[in-house]
């Protein structure tokens, strides 16, 4: 029985606090590394004690496992001035986060700063397949060289060995690594670098064997996406080489996030000792894989959902796998989750506030591990050995299926009555645009922000005190109004054209709304990693969704009362609420999304009635829900766009609908972006030098666009000239009348010391370009 990978963050988010302490200069690297070592040891011991037989190592990362691989193979971009040897810690973090020029800015001094990439922008970051986890995108050139530059996989194996725990090291596969990479050279496919990369992997496998490893897990999730023939050939080539590098070291190729599809033959013909398949996302492939795979192959069955929080129906799973198990040597069947459990919270036992019935329907990483053990014991010892556990599992599934917390006839009836007219604006964009232009009278290149401002320690402290009952609502409201007023006055002072209230009342852009909607449940400690030290607590959609009362009206009214400038109403869109939640698995996602869209539609209507003339409906996560296979895209995009429009179209032509998207590559879904028909879309483009705008120009995208002109995920403060250059790049691609100027995402996670100069520079850059355009 294997776990493939487990959460890295620590039960009390120890990794987050250690990282942020190091980055702020409050603690040395030694403290960070000691915390990381303690987290690894605790994780290994817990898995061992729960009965896991194949415990992973090297699944831990200080920031991101793809970035770890970049460091491991020496693929550090030239701008970070690393040459050889082990990649230093500050170079590692500079690749992830960027950094300022001054050593004092990160609190470290001396040789920790020598030639370690300070003052440089971070590498690009994007979604890990179709999850809400982010990875750092490798940057590879056609003359790229590789060298083993980090012994982390070996070090972690030996670390566990010293504790008396034998582990199975986990590596990101070489083909997936290259498939995820990008190159500055147009037309160059990084897959061509495979012959240069493989010697690094071969050396690493030899070192792992010498250290005492008998198995290694190599993750190749690229096998569930569309591959071209040369990429399939690359997989065969790679594993023919790797299987011979250390012949006594057995390789388990782990494939997850979906069906093998037309890559099935490639996968089962790889010359490896084991193959892991995802039977949660693709249960239909069980029979085919079992029929075609060689019987000397160790078959790892991904039976427990590694991406969602629902308790499994264990008797049903055993019934389903009975035919394959009956025809396969039992010592060659491995029970596992569908994928690494990186994507779920750590332990349900920490949750003391959940209703008992709801809690009985759930399973986090610890409970999923126990479920795996039960399944493994049922196969090895017979069902009678775990009869009590199987009965409890079946009872929980039956209770959930009939619960009144799950089913609301009023919601189901409203969804059934949705009409096509409810998903269309009254007039076309050109009509709306003229009316909105006359209404607002904004200058060219209008400036705004995405919505949130820094959540300072004082803001978090006040929210926590209110949640604990230590701060009355009257006092909490007064505190928030003071924060909102200060933010509005400061925005006016620096000359922003369209303002926001700052979202100080919001803990999270999804959770804030979910807490006010019926059909959701919430955790106290259900944190999962989004990227680096950014952890989120996704709400859980347990039943039919509906809005009970207005959710944002009070705060918007107050902010707008302070200024004659327009203040945007700020909402999270239905697709993002869906994709950033743990979604019920008893309904199609499209049906759940329509329920959420109707709730947001009600809020949009109330905002407009109250006088809001600009309403932003963020769909930051629209693309991440895109299926991994292109053949499945259109069906998803059809209902996702329908849900956005259902949420946004109950307004008059003079009301301007904004939306925001981040972290995404949109070139392949530009039709859907246009079909959303938002009046203004703001997008994340700063890390990729506005590449997306080329696609929008080719498409002749008609509506207004705010390309992000500085990267908020980095602590760097961009100079006026840097921002001006990006605006000029945008002008070469789109008409001046289409362009807005804004950061590429919300500013919640940044410090005011970073935000203030950055936004001042952004406004100055917009004014300079405005003047240049007027005198041209």
Swiss-Prot record:
Family of this protein: Belongs to the vitamin-B12 independent methionine synthase family.
Organism, scientific name: Mesorhizobium japonicum (strain LMG 29417 / CECT 9101 / MAFF 303099) (Mesorhizobium loti (strain MAFF 303099))
Active site residues per record: 713
NCBIfam families membership: met_syn_B12ind, PRK05222.1
Record EC number: 2.1.1.14
Functional note: Catalyzes the transfer of a methyl group from 5-methyltetrahydrofolate to homocysteine resulting in methionine formation.
Name listed for the protein in its UniProt record: 5-methyltetrahydropteroyltriglutamate--homocysteine methyltransferase
Binding positions (Zn(2+)): 660, 662, 684, 745
GO BP annotations, alphabetical order: methionine biosynthetic process; methylation
Lineage: Bacteria, Pseudomonadati, Pseudomonadota, Alphaproteobacteria, Hyphomicrobiales
Positions that bind L-methionine: 450-452, 503, 618
GN (gene name): metE
Binding site for 5-methyltetrahydropteroyltri-L-glutamate: 13-16, 127, 580, 624
UniProt: L-homocysteine binding residues: 450-452, 503, 618
HAMAP family the UniProt entry points to: Meth_synth
Pfam family, one: Meth_synt_1
Enzymatic reactions: 5-methyltetrahydropteroyltri-L-glutamate + L-homocysteine = tetrahydropteroyltri-L-glutamate + L-methionine
CDD domains assigned: CIMS_C_terminal_like, CIMS_N_terminal_like
């Amino acid at each position: 029985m294997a776990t493939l990978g487990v959460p890295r963050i620590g039960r009390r988010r120890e990794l987050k606090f250690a990282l942020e302490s190091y980055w702020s200069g409050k603690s040395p690297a030694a403290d960070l590394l000691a915390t990381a070592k303690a987290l690894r040891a605790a994780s290994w011991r817990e898995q061992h004690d729960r009965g896991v037989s194949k415990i992973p190592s090297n699944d831990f990362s200080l920031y991101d496992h793809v970035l770890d691989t970049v460091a491991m193979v020496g693929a550090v971009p030239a701008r970070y001035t690393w040459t050889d040897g082990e990649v230093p810690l500050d170079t590692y973090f500079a690749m992830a986060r960027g950094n300022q020029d001054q050593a004092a800015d990160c609190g470290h001094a001396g040789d920790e700063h020598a030639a370690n990439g300070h003052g440089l922008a971070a590498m690009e970051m994007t979604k890990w397949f179709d999850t809400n986890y982010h990875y750092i995108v490798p940057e590879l050139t056609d003359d790229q060289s590789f060298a083993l530059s980090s012994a982390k996989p070996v070090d972690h194996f030996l670390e566990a060995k010293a504790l008396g725990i034998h582990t199975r090291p986990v590596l990101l596969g070489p083909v997936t690594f290259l498939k995820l990479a990008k190159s500055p050279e147009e037309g160059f496919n990084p897959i061509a670098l495979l012959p240069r990369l493989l010697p690094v992997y071969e050396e690493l496998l030899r070192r792992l064997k010498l250290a005492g490893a008998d198995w290694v897990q190599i993750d190749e999730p690229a096998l569930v996406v569309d591959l071209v023939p040369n990429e399939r050939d690359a997989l065969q080539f790679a594993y023919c080489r790797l299987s011979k590098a250390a012949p006594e070291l057995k390789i388990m190729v782990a494939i997850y996030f979906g069906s093998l599809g037309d890559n099935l033959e490639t996968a089962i013909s790889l010359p490896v000792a084991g193959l892991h398949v995802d039977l949660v996302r693709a249960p239909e492939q069980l029979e085919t894989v079992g029929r075609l795979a060689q019987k000397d192959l160790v078959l790892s069955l991904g039976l427990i959902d590694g991406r969602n929080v629902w308790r499994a129906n264990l008797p049903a799973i055993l019934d389903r796998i009975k035919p394959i198990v009956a025809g396969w040597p039992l010592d060659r069947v491995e029970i596992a989750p569908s994928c690494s459990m990186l994507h779920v919270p750590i332990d349900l036992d920490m949750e003391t506030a959940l209703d008992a019935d709801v809690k009985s329907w759930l399973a986090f990483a610890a409970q999923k591990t126990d479920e795996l053990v039960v399944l493994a014991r049922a196969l090895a010892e017979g069902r009678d050995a775990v009869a009590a556990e199987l009965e409890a599992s079946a009872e929980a599934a039956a209770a959930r299926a009939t619960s009144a917390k799950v089913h609301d006839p009023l919601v189901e009836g409203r969804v059934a009555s949705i009409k096509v007219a409810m998903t269309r604006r009254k007039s076309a964009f050109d009509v709306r645009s003229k009316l909105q232009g006359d209404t607002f009278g904004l200058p060219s290149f209008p400036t705004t922000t995405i919505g949130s401002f820094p959540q300072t320690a004082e803001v978090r402290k006040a929210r926590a005190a209110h949640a604990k009952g230590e701060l009355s609502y009257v006092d909490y409201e007064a505190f928030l109004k003071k924060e909102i007023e200060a933010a509005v006055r400061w925005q006016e002072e620096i000359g922003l054209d369209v303002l926001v209230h700052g979202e100080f009342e919001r803990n999270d852009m999804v959770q804030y709304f979910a807490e006010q909607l019926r059909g959701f449940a919430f955790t106290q400690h259900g944190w999962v990693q989004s990227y680096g030290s950014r952890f989120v607590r996704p709400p859980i959609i347990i039943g039919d969704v509906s809005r009970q009362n207005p959710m944002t009206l009070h705060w918007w009214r107050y902010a707008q009362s302070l200024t004659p400038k327009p203040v945007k109403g700020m909402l999270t869109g239905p697709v993002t609420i869906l994709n950033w939640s743990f979604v019920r698995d008893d309904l199609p996602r499209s049906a759940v999304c329509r329920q959420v869209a109707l709730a947001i539609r009600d809020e949009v209507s109330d905002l407009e009635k109250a006088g809001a003339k600009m309403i932003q409906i963020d769909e930051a996560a629209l693309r991440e829900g895109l299926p991994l296979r292109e053949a499945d895209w259109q069906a998803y995009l059809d209902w996702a766009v329908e849900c956005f429009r259902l949420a946004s179209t109950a307004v008059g032509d003079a009301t301007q609908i904004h939306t925001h998207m981040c972290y995404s590559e949109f070139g392949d879904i530009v039709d859907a972006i246009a079909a959303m028909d938002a009046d203004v879309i703001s997008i994340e483009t700063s890390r990729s030098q506005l590449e997306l705008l080329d696609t929008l120009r080719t498409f002749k995208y008609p509506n207004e666009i705010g390309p992000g002109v500085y990267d908020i995920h980095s602590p760097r403060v961009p100079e006026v000239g840097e921002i001006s250059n990006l605006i000029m790049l945008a002008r070469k691609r789109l008409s001046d009348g289409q362009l807005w100027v804004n950061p590429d995402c919300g500013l919640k996670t940044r410090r005011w010391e970073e935000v203030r100069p950055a936004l001042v520079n952004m406004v100055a850059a917009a004014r300079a370009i405005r003047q240049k355009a007027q005198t041209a």
